[in-house]
């Protein structure tokens, strides 16, 4: 029996819509392929970092562009690996290229900190 990976495989437009909807949470989205050397070199680091976070805190997801390349088009992904850092349906940052586990962990921490910010006065009044 294999262990469940600490990330979700995104395989449909419905999955993407779930991530991108307002209230969709905090997400690290990795566009990758098995034929991409840097993607495969980063795979273990991605899994390791994903395992360090609670899914309620930040959700790690992967889109295999070989089998689901159509899901990359709306994000204008032209190179892989591409990682998107998303909160509440908004892309806050994008990184193209291999990331170390340390850098990925730091980016995920940054994303979590953005999601935990309390709204300012205007946000409380009009949000």
Segments the model singles out, each with a brief description of its role:
Residues 79-119:
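Non-catalytic, surface beta->alpha helical segment in thiol-disulfide oxidoreductase systems
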Residues 1-27, 106-127:
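N-terminal leader/targeting and pre-domain segments
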Residues 58-60:
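Hydrophobic/aromatic anchor residues within beta-strands of the central parallel beta-sheet
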Residues 24, 32-35, 79:
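Short pre-active-site segment immediately N-terminal to redox-active cysteine/selenocysteine motifs
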Residues 38-54:
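Typically the conserved alpha-helix immediately C-terminal to a functionally engaged Cys/Sec
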């Amino acid at each position: 029996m294999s262990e469940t990976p600490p990330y979700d495989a995104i395989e449909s437009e419905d999955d993407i819509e779930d991530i991108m909807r307002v209230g969709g949470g905090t997400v690290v989205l990795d566009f990758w392929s098995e034929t991409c050397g840097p993607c495969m070199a980063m795979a273990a680091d991605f899994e390791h970092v994903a395992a360090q976070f609670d899914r309620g805190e930040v959700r790690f997801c992967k889109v295999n562009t070989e089998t689901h390349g159509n899901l990359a088009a709306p994000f204008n992904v032209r190179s892989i690996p591409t990682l998107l850092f998303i909160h509440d349906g908004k892309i806050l940052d994008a990184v193209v290229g291999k990331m170390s586990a340390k850098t990925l962990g730091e980016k995920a921490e940054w994303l979590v900190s953005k999601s935990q910010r309390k709204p300012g006065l205007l946000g409380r009044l009009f949000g």
